[in-house]
């Protein structure tokens, strides 16, 4: 177990717009685990709705959208969960990231949790999200968590190994951020 500074800000993002989706379940576990640390944590859950579509650098977006972009920009660490859709990460996640100014994110750290119905596409999506993080000059934990949907049931993670791997991803990502 690592000791982290209270002034470290963590943003957990559930990148699926589907309510009660496996991505949301997975990232709620991450939020609960992070809350045990001595850090500030916020949760952006795209399934809650109310996030606008990016239309360029205009100022008339709703408060929820602008606050999410501000929270992401101010966070030291991004813990991102995304489903795989046709070997691609979530378009809703991509839309949210469009609101973030890459000039204000250098040196941040990200951890990834990726969920799919089967075993195909994980490294494709890992590569795409890592490249996106690179554009934002965000250092990405090289060990993501890959989860298949059969590890979820009745709104819960049913595989203890998945919980353990998510916890390890959080710890390693926070340790990487601490060293950065």
Residue spans of the language-model regions?
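Short helix/strand-capping connector loops at secondary-structure junctions
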Residues: 145-157
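Short, glycine-/small-residue-rich phosphate/pyrophosphate-handling segment
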Residues: 110-147
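N-terminal beta1-alpha1-beta2 submodule of the flavodoxin-like/Rossmannoid cofactor-binding fold
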Residues: 1-102, 156-180
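A glycine-biased structural micro-motif
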Residues: 106-107
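Short, histidine-centered active-site or binding-site loop motifs used for metal coordination
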Residues: 14-16, 114-116, 149-151
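Short alpha-helical linear motifs
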Residues: 133, 151, 168-169
